[in-house]
């Protein structure tokens, strides 16, 4: 009986690890597909990545204000 219990425990542990690894791989590829879904947004962020953090936040705010304000006045 202990042999069967050990076998079942090892099998269950193996399956849990397999499904955990599969979920991690799926989530990594799912997050990469979002970059293809919204290419312009990630391109704008990449453009300002090498700036100083304060300049980056300022430039992103200016960029967002330019893209948001025309919709507010129409």
UniProtKB/Swiss-Prot annotation:
Superkingdom field: Bacteria
Name recorded for this polypeptide: Putative protein YozX
Organism name: Bacillus subtilis (strain 168)
